[in-house]
């Protein structure tokens, strides 16, 4: 691991932080930030080397996302989400890889994967329509991975349902402006996308189940450890890394603010044992959340690198660990922010923005614990979870 991208982020830290304020104002990642991210190759970290990528260890990717998010939450969020898409494109049809990366390896892809569209088969491909929310960083992307349900030729959904990941160029979808008016992660520009009767050739479509269970990468023939990693470990990694990084940024700004503060009782925070205890506990919890997430990806990497099978139980435990890491970090900042006093609520203080952005990150579907914890517990008890309990695992 070389951490080249991380070092370059550190060298531009002051500018990246300042641009986070601009992102909040304009409702998307600032153009200057996107230019910096492209210049240092932040989105190429998980991209194949044959297409100008770095094939970085996912731990290095996660740590780099954390740092970006600690400075500029919206940029870190986009880094974590858009930065995972090259990992999946690495085992899509070589023809679409060439279309996207052939002339510019810094081409970005948006999402989301949620099935907001319908694919109706036609000659050599599909007729594709739908609407999707939450397309993070979409203003800076030229292609998108969009989730859809497979239909028959009459437009009726296949039974049992079959989900697809559709790869589509910017010319075939519309970004709906003013569709991202939210209280947190405002600077991500996670706007709605609309597709109307676009033609999608077969080679630009991936079967969702095959992506998640590893069939797609095996069919492609990839042998690199990076691309053999489970989807359930890689896809959530950037999102949770960004969330933890935002919490680290919140803690940094809280410490800076509290260092010279006198509380309402006239006591310096440095002399207040109760606040100091809360800060200490929160610091330990955020560090533990970080270390847990990184150890989780290391553990999975070592297993895959050794050629061992990753069972459903192990995938479920990995997801359980990832979800809990996010919640632990969020709970920690909730012990810090209320102890920063009334002035910490002011909009000219970064504390409130980091707090809002961290909580918005917690709302992502990948951080919902219910079915993940349920499936992990059943697996440990020797049962085989079925149906919705297997979703995103």
Curated annotation (Swiss-Prot):
Cysteine pairings via disulfide bonds: none
InterPro entries in the record: Acyl-CoA_dehydrogenase (IPR050741), Acyl-CoA_DH_C (IPR013107), Acyl-CoA_Oxase/DH_mid-dom_sf (IPR046373), AcylCo_DH-like_C (IPR036250), AcylCoA_DH/ox_N_sf (IPR037069), AcylCoA_DH/oxidase_NM_dom_sf (IPR009100)
UniProt feature coiled coil, ranges: none
Signal peptide extent: none
GO molecular function per UniProt: acyl-CoA dehydrogenase activity; flavin adenine dinucleotide binding; oxidoreductase activity, acting on paired donors, with incorporation or reduction of molecular oxygen, reduced flavin or flavoprotein as one donor, and incorporation of one atom of oxygen; pigment binding
Cellular component terms (Gene Ontology): cytoplasm
Pfam families: Acyl-CoA_dh_2 (PF08028)
GO biological process, one term: fatty acid beta-oxidation using acyl-CoA dehydrogenase
Keywords in alphabetical order: Oxidoreductase, Pigment
Name of the protein: Pigment production hydroxylase
């Amino acid at each position: 691991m070389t951490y080249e991208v991380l070092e370059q982020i550190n060298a531009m830290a002051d500018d990246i932080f300042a641009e986070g304020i601009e992102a909040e104002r304009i409702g998307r990642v600032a153009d200057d930030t996107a230019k910096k991210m492209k210049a240092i190759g932040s989105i190429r970290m998980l991209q194949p080397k044959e297409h100008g990528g770095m094939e970085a260890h996912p731990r290095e990717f996660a740590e780099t996302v954390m740092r970006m998010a600690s400075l500029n939450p919206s940029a870190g969020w986009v880094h974590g989400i858009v930065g995972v898409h090259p990992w999946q494109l690495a085992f899509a049809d070589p023809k679409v890889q060439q279309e996207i990366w052939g002339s510019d390896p810094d081409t970005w892809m948006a999402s989301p994967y949620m099935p907001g569209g319908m694919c109706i088969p036609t000659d050599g491909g599909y007729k594709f329509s739908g609407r999707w929310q939450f397309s993070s960083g979409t203003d800076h992307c030229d292609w998108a991975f969009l989730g859809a349900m497979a239909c028959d030729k009459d437009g009726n959904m296949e039974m049992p349902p079959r989900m697809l990941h559709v790869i589509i160029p910017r010319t075939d979808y519309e970004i709906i402006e003013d569709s991202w008016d939210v209280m947190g992660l405002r600077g991500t520009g996670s706007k709605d996308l609309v597709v109307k009767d676009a033609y999608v050739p077969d080679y630009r479509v991936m079967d969702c189940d095959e992506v998640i269970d590893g069939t797609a990468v095996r069919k492609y023939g990839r042998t690199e450890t990076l691309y053999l990693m489970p989807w359930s470990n890689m896809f959530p990694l950037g999102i949770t890394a960004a969330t933890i990084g935002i919490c680290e940024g919140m803690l940094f700004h809280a410490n800076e603010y509290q260092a010279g503060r006198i509380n309402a009782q006239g006591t310096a925070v440095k002399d207040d044992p109760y606040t100091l205890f809360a800060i200490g506990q929160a610091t330990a919890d955020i560090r533990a959340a970080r270390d847990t997430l990184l150890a989780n990806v290391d553990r999975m990497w070592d297993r895959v690198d050794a050629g061992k099978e990753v069972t459903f139980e192990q995938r479920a435990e990995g997801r359980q660990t990832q979800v809990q890491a996010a919640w632990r970090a969020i709970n920690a900042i909730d012990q810090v922010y209320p102890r920063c006093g009334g002035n910490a609520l002011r909009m000219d203080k970064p504390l409130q923005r980091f707090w809002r952005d961290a909580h918005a990150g917690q709302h992502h579907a990948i951080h919902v614990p219910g079915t993940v914890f349920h499936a992990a517990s059943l697996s440990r008890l020797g049962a085989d979870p079925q149906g919705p309990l297997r979703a995103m695992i």
